[in-house]
Amino acid sequence: MDFRENSRLGVVGEEKHLHDGVLQIFWQQVLHHSPEEMRMACFFDSSIPWQMSVYHSMKWVPHIWSESGEVRFLAGDKEAAAEILPDLTRELSAQKEQVSFLIFLLDPMLILGEVLQSLLQEGKADRVMVVGIAGKEQELPKEYRSRMIWQKDRQELQLYEKDKRITVPVQYD
């Protein structure tokens, strides 16, 4: 999947499918990009077991650390989010075009408001990709134009290619 064309991706499905979909995207990007090319952040709910499982996978990779290596961009509650947001915002606003950011918003309540809106808006030279989740497609904000639908009765990937929506039926195991 090309995140340059599909930089706002919503993963829709039941908890098991959300877990698998998020980790699939995460590992694909980790294996294809060095930490110098792509950094990652994750905002999750530490009270939800599957999201803690995602956290335990993410915490080991160097892509999660700030450029200085002092901050791990993982937040499972409001206090942790408040601690990492200044460093993350600073790195996002730096004009280092060679570094992209992939942000997993498993719990968008941790960064509501202006920061969330700025993350969800796409820019021309967008180096910020966002992955969000929802149990149902209607629950996704409109900014998530591309969707990975992972439900019992409907399994498809909806992507945009040059402003044209392409729907690809897929079989998730």
Per-segment meaning from a language model:
Residues M1-D173:
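Accessory regions of macromolecular translocation/handling assemblies
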